Amino acid sequence: MFKFNDEKGQLKCSFCGKTQDQVRKLVAGPGVYICDECIELCNEIIEEELGISEFVDFGEVPKPQEIRHILSDYVIGQERAKKALAVAVYNHYKRINSNETKEDEVELSKSNICLIGPTGSGKTLLAQTLARILNVPFAIADATSLTEAGYVGEDVENILLKLIQSADYDVEKAEKGIIYIDEIDKVARKSENPSITRDVSGEGVQQALLKILEGTVASVPPQGGRKHPHQELIQIDTGNILFIVGGAFDGIEQIVKNRMGEKVIGFGTDNAKLKDDETYLSRVVPEDLLKFGLIPEFIGRLPVIATLEQLDEAALVSILTEPKNALVKQYKRMLELDDVELEFEPTALIEIAKEAIERKTGARGLRSIIEQIMLEVMFEIPSRDDITKCIITEKAARGEEEPQLQLEDGSIIPIKTSA
């Protein structure tokens, strides 16, 4: 090992032998010194050994078509929204790369995204999948839990803390992450005119979000909660964080109809009404969001608006079977681990989709429906070694009969009588 001091009495790195004048930093330990260059080299070696993948290289952001293609592996339908998101995300990270290289005199502004669509249409899943594609830190926040600073509730800075935690407290990586704020429509002000009284959970939250959406250096308490004097704070620049906000915006279709000067006369079928609402939803413009209750400054920070359609029966059946992480595939795999084959009759899948539509939960409610159907199956099968197959029939999906079990001898019996 190298000596700690040279002839001139200067401290030296114990590993490479460079003096303190030859390096930027020299860190002292118990009887040892290490320079910043050796620390960086050690870090590179460890990352290489462990196979740690770096976050996205912003010089090689996937093209919009590639992003949409990968989104389609996990999200069924919603092609218009996927295209809008793919373009917005590609431009966002291309902008980061451009602004960092400073080769161009033109500084590109940030394009945050507003997703409008019914419950269970895939807003959260789209945002999560985008973060997975880009391998960037990701955080989800619920707008209904937020309040203006100084009032009971969660400060907007706590959203940033979730992102920092997602990046393992690496602030530099967190500064290029994605934040999804759900239920943003719930913080709309109650009327189009500015309120005289303080609206701390509505307009007040929008006002509090303005700066971090636009880009600011925010001070975040490391443990969350309220800020206190003399407390150590984490500084994070939100200028390159992509914000995606989402909400159902119930009733915005009527605002669009009124703007377009159209009225609905008579009573149509549910399907006709659904198609009608989807048509108007796709025509939402910033003016409609203003009428709904978002403040002009907030809308101005959400230049990209993407709408999602209500999922119909066919789309829900596809969601059950087609994506890489489809629920049917997951349950089949779970029973496969117990050496049992699982079969869903096609009509059973249709019944499950109908139930989700009836409950108005969209794709989000599919898992709870299947879980209810599969409860007895998953309770019974691990204790049996004579079952080879489980069949979910149309009647079982409707709750009119129990799932059917096929035994080793080929006989088929309902699960309740199988004990």
UniProtKB/Swiss-Prot annotation:
UniProt subunit comment: Component of the ClpX-ClpP complex. Forms a hexameric ring that, in the presence of ATP, binds to fourteen ClpP subunits assembled into a disk-like structure with a central cavity, resembling the structure of eukaryotic proteasomes.
Family under the similarity heading: Belongs to the ClpX chaperone family.
GO cellular component terms attached to this protein's record: HslUV protease complex
Source organism, top-level taxon: Bacteria
Residues binding ATP, per UniProt: P118, T119, G120, S121, G122, K123, T124, L125
Binding residues for Zn(2+): C13, C16, C35, C38
Stated role: ATP-dependent specificity component of the Clp protease. It directs the protease to specific substrates. Can perform chaperone functions in the absence of ClpP.
Classification via SUPFAM superfamilies: Glucocorticoid receptor-like (DNA-binding domain), P-loop containing nucleoside triphosphate hydrolases
Coiled coil: none
Keywords: ATP-binding, Chaperone, Metal-binding, Nucleotide-binding, Zinc
A molecular function (GO) term: ATP hydrolysis activity
InterPro entries: AAA+_ATPase, ATP-dep_Clp_protease_ClpX, ATPase_AAA_core, Clp_ATPase_C, Clp_protease_ATP-bd_su_ClpX, ClpX_bact, P-loop_NTPase, Znf_CppX_C4
Protein's UniProt keywords contain Nucleus: no
Protein name: ATP-dependent Clp protease ATP-binding subunit ClpX
GO annotation terms (biological process): cell division; proteolysis involved in protein catabolic process
Domain ClpX-type ZB: 1-54
